Regions:
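Short alpha-helical segment of the dimerization/phosphotransfer core of two-component systems
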Residues: 22-27
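Helix-loop junction within the histidine kinase core
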Residues: 38-49
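A conserved beta-strand-to-alpha-helix junction within the catalytic ATP-binding
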Residues: 48-63, 95, 121
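Short conserved segment of the HATPase_c
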Residues: 140, 146-148, 160-172
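Short alpha-helical Gxxx[C/S/T] motif in the catalytic ATP-binding
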Residues: 187, 191
Length: 233
């Protein structure tokens, strides 16, 4: 109908069709969130690790979001980091993590704002972290070498008060005063579970009125042999 192949439309009809399309996309997103959440809750969502280039993965997600950001008047920046090695990760799950974080910024950053996506090698001092090393994962002997990738999504949005910076990752949690925004409070909860499923951890740094910076770590895994590629856990 929107192509007007069946006849011309007036402005009101175009507006109604746009609203219908937007509602359909929201419903599709809600269904996807519920299915992902349910699979994570029941342990039915398995991680599938394969060696890949994380720069390509992040760039692909940015391309998918670029049009929507432009339409809202937001700037989205990603600069590939050539210091990142090829290592095994679950590309579809990582894409979902990044997409959810970008969607979160998209919802709350006002027109004229900016969002940055950045990734870099990182030395994860697990003994100082709240989350223990996952079973079977060996620490590198040379602790001076990066053992993880740190991915960050920063924005110029309204920020998150300190008292809610842990709760934002809880199931169905929504910040007070954000009820008018789309969503059910599952996006960041799904992000947390997916990151933890990849052996990582996630946190947010923010000051009210000064934007947000969501960061997560994913440990480097050894590149599997030909016989072990595509192994799930």
């Amino acid at each position: 109908l929107q192509s007007e192949k069946l006849g011309s439309l007036n402005d009101r009809q175009r507006e109604v069709l746009r609203d219908m399309q937007s509602s359909g996309k929201r419903l599709q997103q809600f269904i996807q969130d519920f299915l992902t959440y349910s699979a994570l809750e029941t342990g039915g969502l398995k991680m599938q690790f394969a060696a890949g280039n994380i720069n390509e993965c992040l760039s692909d997600v940015c391309r998918l979001w670029s049009t929507r950001f432009q339409e809202k008047g937001l700037a989205l920046y990603f600069l590939a980091n050539d210091k990142l090695p090829v290592f095994p990760f679950d590309s579809p799950k990582l894409e979902r993590v990044i997409s959810n974080l970008l969607e979160n910024s998209f919802k709350f950053v006002p027109r004229g704002g900016t969002v940055w996506l950045h990734a870099e090698p990182h030395m994860w001092e697990r003994r100082a972290a709240a989350q223990p090393a996952s079973a079977g994962e060996r620490r590198r002997q040379d602790t001076s070498q990066p053992n993880a990738v740190k991915v960050s999504v920063s924005d110029t949005g309204p920020g998150i008060p300190a008292e809610y910076q842990q709760e934002v990752f809880d199931d169905f949690f929504r910040l007070p005063g954000t009820e008018s925004h789309e969503g059910m409070g599952l996006g960041l909860a799904i992000v947390r579970r997916l990151v933890q499923g990849m052996g990582g951890k996630i946190w947010v740094e923010s000051d009210p009125g000064a934007g947000c910076k969501f960061s997560f770590l994913i440990p480097f895994k050894p590149v599997p042999s030909a016989a072990g590629k595509g192994k799930t856990r």
